[in-house]
Every structure is written in C-alpha cells, then in structure tokens.
Regions:
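Non-heme Fe(II) oxygenase metal-center motifs and adjacent flexible, charged/small-residue loops
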Residues: 1-198
Length: 198
C-alpha cells in the first residue's frame, strides 16, 4: 500500500494537502540546506503588485527539465538545468508522491522578517490541478491555508527536511501564505516541485 494511504488530509473540504513530516534524517537535511544556501545562484525576486515594480528581499532560483519560461506576477523566469542534488531530491519526492515533476522553484527566506502573503499557485504555466510538492529546509515556519469562500484557516508547521503535497483542486479553492515572525532569526529554504505545461 502506498504510504500516502496512512496519512491524513489536512484540509476539511475542496482540496487535498498531505503532510509527510520529515523525509530526511537531520544530517541529510543539514547537508542539503547548507549546500543549497551556498551553491544556488540566488536572485532577488521581482514582482509587480498593483502596477508597481517591487524587488523583494526573498531570493529565488528556478530549475527545470528544459529551458522553461515561467511567468509569475508579470515577472519572467527562465529555468536552469538540474543539479545532481536537486535531481536526487526530485527522485525522492517523486517516489513518495507517485508523481513526476519537471521543474522546481527555490525560495530563500533569510529570517522571519521575510514571508509571503495569501496566494494560490494557479498560474497558467502550471498544469491545472497538478500536484505541487513542497520540501522545507532550515527554520521551521507556520504554513496556513485559507479557504477562498468560507475563509476557514488550517495551519501546519513545516519542519526541517519535511514534505508537504498540495493536490487536485487545492489551488482553486484554497490560498496559502508564509506569515512573517520576528521570533524567527534563522533562514529557510523551500523547494516547490511542479508540473509545468509543455
């Protein structure tokens, strides 16, 4: 039986979010965290909000099977070729989730002063209703979901070396965010494996 059969859906309706918890040992997670922090060609994220061009403190990097172009908030990103580390993580996540991914967006939050507001990963360049796998390294951060209609909020704490899956119609019906917290002084790296339209 697939491991997911033993795990509980975090969402009460209109979507599926499965939290696997830690999928790596502490030593493995530390190794990936420090290597990604030092070796990734991080760039400040650039977005357009209400017509204003904003350069965020949060940094990103984008990898994929081919030279994908990803459009996010009117910002164009071009995929870099996979590294060996990311391929290893991709294979691990694919085996656990029984899903194939063709791209990965990396986010670096330097501390709790950096976060993300409410949004859905429902851009046209992402396959509709496809699974998105989120792997977290570094500081533990609260990750809330908010239903788009009834505004119900459900939260999970994303641990160092953990995996969260968001599946099917989750992006249509739920928003998610990464709230800021002054208590958090350590960096966090998040990898979101996705299926892009080809």
């Amino acid at each position: 039986m697939h491991i997911e059969s033993y795990l509980t859906n975090l969402l009460s309706m209109d979507g599926i979010a499965i939290y696997y918890g830690k999928i790596l040992t502490f030593a493995e997670a530390n190794g990936y965290f420090h290597s990604l922090l030092q070796n990734t060609p991080w760039k400040n994220d650039e977005v357009v909000v209400f017509g204003k061009h904003i350069v965020t403190k949060r940094k990103t990097a984008w990898y994929g099977d081919s030279n994908y172009v990803y459009i996010y908030s009117n910002s164009i990103k071009q995929a870099l070729p996979w590294t060996r580390e990311l391929i290893n993580l991709k294979h691990l996540v694919e085996n656990l989730s029984n899903t194939k991914f063709n791209s990965c967006l990396l986010n670096l939050y330097h501390d709790g002063n950096e976060g993300m507001g409410w949004h859905s990963d429902d851009e046209k360049s992402i396959e509709e209703n496809s699974t998105i796998a989120s792997v977290s390294f570094g500081a533990e951060r609260k990750f809330p979901f908010k239903h788009k209609q009834n505004k119900k909020i459900i939260s999970v704490l994303l641990e160092h070396g953990s995996l969260l899956l968001m599946k099917k119609v989750t992006q249509k019906n739920w928003l998610h965010s990464l709230p800021k917290s002054k208590k958090i002084t350590l960096p966090r790296i998040n990898l979101t494996f996705r299926r892009m339209v080809t």
